[in-house]
Amino acid sequence: AVFATGARWTTTGYSPYRPERSNIPGCHLPIVMDIKTAIEVVLASPDGLGKNVIILDETGEYLPLGLAELLADSKIAVEIISPRSFIGADTQRTLDMPYVMPRLKNLNVRLSPLHFIEEIYEDSISVYDIWGGEPTYRTDVSAVIMAMTQNPNDALYSEVKEHVLAYKLGDMIAPRRIEAIIYEAEKLGRDI
């Protein structure tokens, strides 16, 4: 049996940019949500996340940008915060950047690269510049969306691996880019 059950987004805020802490203080508050859940909420109700949404992105990929665009199209205030040098870095590799970024700017999405969330409160957050200085605050925050780490969905594999010849594939081993998973799947298929 080959298991490719994927991974689920986390909301802890754990980051290799802040290895000294296991989470962002306040990550368990009701305003915090993972990006997959946030997209489901917005697709069901465009204003389901409230009127002022913060997206903390460590992926550099399209998903947080797409969510920001959906929200901003519905007149929701959106800010994308990332510790990376620029927002949506992976869209440069996929050649999406010259199309996506102008749309986000035209929709007044605030982009804050080289920043990170220090703490989450009931309706606000403190943000710091990774190069130093005093934290700044964002108030009247209705939702904080985490697009950061993922945990493998390996429960089913763990249950049956003692009873059948079982192989793991894809994000359930370690979340990563689709190209690596395609390569791994072909290699596994050939090996079997």
What feature does the model see in each segment?
Residues 1-11, 27-28, 40-42, 49-51, ...:
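A Rossmann-like FAD-binding core segment of flavoenzymes
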Residues 10-74, 162-177:
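Glycine-rich dinucleotide-binding loop and its adjacent helix/turn
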Residues 20-21, 96-99, 184-187:
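Short, hinge-like loop/turn segments at secondary-structure boundaries
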Residues 34-37, 155-156, 184:
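Well-ordered alpha-helical segments embedded in enzymatic catalytic cores
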Residues 65, 93-94, 157, 178-182:
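Conserved strand-to-helix beginnings and helix N-cap segments that scaffold or border functional pockets
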Residues 69, 73, 158, 187-190:
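Short, well-ordered alpha-helices that flank and scaffold nucleotide-derived cofactor binding pockets
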Residues 70, 82, 184:
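Acidic donor-binding helix in nucleotide-sugar-dependent glycosyltransferases
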Residues 180-192:
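An active-site-proximal "capping" alpha-helix that borders the catalytic cofactor pocket
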